[in-house]
Each structure stands twice: as structure tokens, then as C-alpha cells.
Amino acid sequence: LTLLRERKAPTIHDVARVAKLSKSTVSNVIRNAPGVSAETRARVQAAITELGYKTNIVARQLAQQRTRVLGVVIGDLANPFYAEMAKLLESFAAARGFQVMFCNTQVDEEVELAGIRSLLEHRVAGLLFLAYAGSAGGAQAAVGGNLPVVFVTCSADWGDVVAVDDFGGVAAATQHLIGLGHRRIAYFADTVIEENADNDRKAGYIRAMTRAGHRPQLLRWDAKPDTVIADGETRSIRSVLTGPGRMTGIVAANDLHAIDVLDCADRLGLSVPGQLSVVGFDDIAIAGLARIGLTTIAQPKEMMAQIAIETLERRISGALRGGRLRQITDFTFVERTTTGKAQE
């Protein structure tokens, strides 16, 4: 019988022997350290190619007590906005030599905290939050003060922030409806009350309504089908959109909520924008489809993702030190076909 022995993988010692250089010189070439001549680099590369040597990137990074991996905490991947932002973050991270690990929390504090701890166990070099449930303070305690953190499209009282002007965006959306003659305009959000972007957006709506002398009306989905919470009471969506004193304009906290409202209007036989005008927020890809044509506030997703990755990389490298950065980008008002002049 012929016994086949597994070929031993070449080591850095083998590369040094073939290149006729010291192990430390070979290591400098592999690490792309400065001060190494082009001739020496060529000799090492030739030896690596001849032997089929592969560097153990993970082992090398762990030995240096860091990895080139970033953790991204996502609120809900079912929301296209988060999915679009996650893709952009991954792309910009890859361009800078980082890999990305994702944690989908459903904006649940316990799930969020467990996910953060898992990312920390993988020794991520930094964290990016696309949504922040708060984790009852546990997230900040788990992360500590040494790991760079950037909040993207959301905010907290710790870490750097990259976000759009949420307040100004919703104020502009509300003013647009007021300018079209609408008076009964509601702000529509989810049952999950977030302590960051949603509060700023809600405040922008309230400011615009009160300055125009109109009564703000806050709505959010109830747990029961086709019902909402209005003024602390459970009401049917039908009564809000078709009953006495019905709403003629809706400003939604995001595009998904706006599309939900459009669906309700369709089932109730309401014409949009004839009987109801709707504005969203985010400008997700499907908002621009001809069958939807959603008027919305566009976030500069690509710009925010790029700024977030650059900020985190500078924190990791030590090029950026000092206090928290809060970088706020401008929004773009995108008028499509779901808004029109008030008919009553």
C-alpha cells in the first residue's frame, strides 16, 4: 500500500529560506512595512509564489489584538432602507480593506445587546449602528470606551453620529402639504417609539404644524389590524381617513409607513392625491417606481455611508481623536405623484 502524506503548508521560515533572507525581512514585506527595497520585495514575492505560501491574515490580526472586521448593527433588514445602507457600508468598507459582520436586532433591546456582545467576541475593530434600540444602557457598557462607534442615520448620547437633517426634512414635508392647502395633516409612525431619528422627525412635523396654526395629530399603528393610536385612543384607520374631520394629508416617518398608508387608501377607495396626499421619508428604491410614485424626503445614503466608514477608519487608526463628532447632511425633497392640492 502506498501511504499518501498530506503536504505540509509552507511557513514563513520556508519563504525566508528560499528567498535567502531573514524571517524578519520577509515579515516586513508581508506587512508592507516601509523601508524595504523593491528588489527585496520581488525576491520575497517570487518565493511566496514558488511555495504557494498564504499569509494567515486572521492569526496576524489577532496577534496584533485587532481585526480588519467591522460590526454593523441593523434595526430591521426587512426595511429596504436598512438593506440599501448595509450594502453601501459593506462596499465602502471593502474598498478600505475591511470586512463586515452584520447583526439584525429588530430594534429589540435584548436582541441588540446579545448581538453587540457577539460582535465584540469576534474582536471587531469598530461598530456601526444603523438603528439603536438603546439596550437600557447595556450597549455602551458592553462596548466600553476603547472601541470606536459611529451611529449612522440614528443617534445616541455616545459615539460619533452621521445623519441627515431629520427635523428639517419632515418640517419641509409638512410645509409642502400646508402649501398645497392641507390643514388636517397627521404624522404617522410605527408602534416602536425610537429615541433618535423618529423623535427629531416628529418634532419637525409639530413645529411646522404649530407655526402654521394647525393642530398636530400623531398616529401610530396599533397591535390590531387596520387600527391606529390617536390621542391615546384606538381608532380604525378608516375613521381617520374617511370619517368626520378626516385627515387629508399624511407625513410618514419612513417610506414603508407611507406605502402602508397608500395601501390602506387603496383598500378604502380613496384616490391619491385627489382625496389624500402622502409624503414619506428615506427615498428607498421602490418609492420611485411608477406604480408608487411616492413624494418623499431623500437621504443621501451613499454620502452618509462613505462619511461613516471614513470616520470609523480614522478613529481606528488614531488619525481622529478627541470628542464626539456629529455630522449632519442635507436632505433632498423629491416630489412625485402622491401629493396634490387639498380638495376640501
Show where each model-derived region lies.
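ATP/adenylate-binding site constellation spanning eukaryotic-like Ser/Thr protein kinases
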Residues: 41, 67, 86, 182, ...
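Alpha-helical recognition/docking segments in bacterial nutrient-uptake
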Residues: 1-10, 57, 65-175, 179, ...
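A general structural signal for well-ordered alpha-helical segments in protein cores
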Residues: 12, 23, 41, 59, ...
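Short gly/ser/thr-rich secondary-structure transition/capping motifs
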Residues: 50-56, 110, 130-132, 231, ...
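Bacterial carbohydrate/catabolite-sensing allosteric modules
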Residues: 1-5, 50, 91-96, 120, ...
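N-terminal helix-turn-helix DNA-binding module of bacterial transcription factors
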Residues: 1-68, 343
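Short beta-strand segments enriched in small/hydrophobic residues
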Residues: 18, 23-28, 62-78, 176, ...
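Secondary-structure boundary/capping motif
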Residues: 36, 81, 111, 196-197, ...
